[in-house]
Structures are given as C-alpha cells and as structure tokens.
Amino acid sequence: MAFTEIKHPLIIDKLTRMRKTETSSKDFRENLNEIAQLMVYEIFRDLKLEPVEITTPVAKTTGYTINQPVVLVPILRAGIGMLDGIQKLIPTARIAHVGLYRDETTLEIHQYFAKTTKDIDKSYVIVVDPMLATGGSACKAIDIVKQWGAKEVKFVCLVAVEPGIKRLQEQHPDVEIYAASKDEKLNEKGYIIPGLGDAGDRIFGTK
C-alpha cells in the first residue's frame, strides 16, 4: 500500500523545532500535537459521507456529514502524544490502546497491554506512533487491531525510515502509511537518524 510523506511548510517548521536537543518537553508536546492536527486533512481524505437535508438561514439544501466511526489506537506510551491534535478535528473518535515495549538488547517487541473499543470492525482505524523505525512495534500493533476485527487500518507517524516502511508494507500490504518526514537511516541501536531522539522520554520528560 502507499507511503505518503505529508510535506507542508508548517509541518516542516514544527518538526525542525522538535528535532532540536534544547526543545523542552512542553514545546515538544505542543508541536507534536500541532503536526498531528495538520496531518488530519490528508489522513482522513477518504472518510465516508452521507447526505443530510438541512436548512440554512435562507434556504433548504443538502449537506454531507461523516457517517463512519473513527477509532484511534495510540501505541503506548509515545502514541498518546498525538491524540489531542487529531481529536480536536475528530472529537467523536473513540480510543483503543496497545501497550508495547522494545527489548533494547534484542530489539524484540513485547506486548504488555491491549484494550479495544466497540464496533472496531466497522470503524476507520488509525494506529499512531511518532516513530516508524524498525517497524516492529507498528506491525505488532496492527496485528493486534486486526485480531480485534479491524478491516480499514492506517498507520500515522511523524518520522519514518525505509526499513520500517518496507517491513510494514511487506507484513501489512493493505495498510496505508503517513509520515511527516522520511528520514535517512537507522543507527546500530535501531534509532532513526537524524530523528527526534526517544519520543516517549521527550514527551513525558522522563530523561
């Protein structure tokens, strides 16, 4: 399925601010949410609409309203940082959760939490995580939401690299990938270069 890099001057500017080592957790979180909000327009381009009859101050007409439920699935913990920005434009979205952690020695992904929501099989499901590095977490999370019954799934991140993109496309060819930036490479520890550092630590100020 397609990989889309959403390029826009506002996104590029805010992402540059996030990359800087000296950026505070507060500013990092704010820019993360603002970028997520800016990406919404492209991510939800094909949401289903239904006609509704309405009355304006001067006439009756036909309008259109979204008739497809949306479920956001943050990969804990860093994915939580993207929710507010998306929910500002999609306030009716329900939230499911997938908790994963990576063994820093083996780079293997382990699940520690998962909580679904109703009607996920009928919903437009967006899995969110700031980083798409090796692709292990993204693939594991999408495995889980598909086990829940999700049929229409997209993956949204800020920064992605080719190994993660390729792995996700190979394991889940039906899932569209959206990123604010395609970065250069992974280092020997599996971190994105130039990247953002550890997004979870920077969001929550834990380092």
Swiss-Prot record:
As recorded in UniProt, its EC number(s) are: 2.4.2.9
Enumerate the residues binding uracil. 192, 197-199
Q: Which residues cross the membrane?
A: none
Q: Which InterPro entries match?
A: PRibTrfase_dom (IPR000836), PRTase-like (IPR029057), Upp_B (IPR034332), UPRTase/APRTase (IPR050054), Ura_phspho_trans (IPR005765)
Q: Which domain of life is it from?
A: Bacteria
EC class name: transferase
PANTHER family from the UniProt entry:
ADENINE PHOSPHORIBOSYLTRANSFERASE, URACIL PHOSPHORIBOSYLTRANSFERASE, CHLOROPLASTIC
Q: Give the protein name, as stated in the record.
A: Uracil phosphoribosyltransferase
**Which organism's genome codes for this protein?**
Mycoplasma mycoides subsp. mycoides SC (strain CCUG 32753 / NCTC 10114 / PG1)
Classification of source organism: Bacteria, Bacillati, Mycoplasmatota, Mollicutes, Mycoplasmataceae
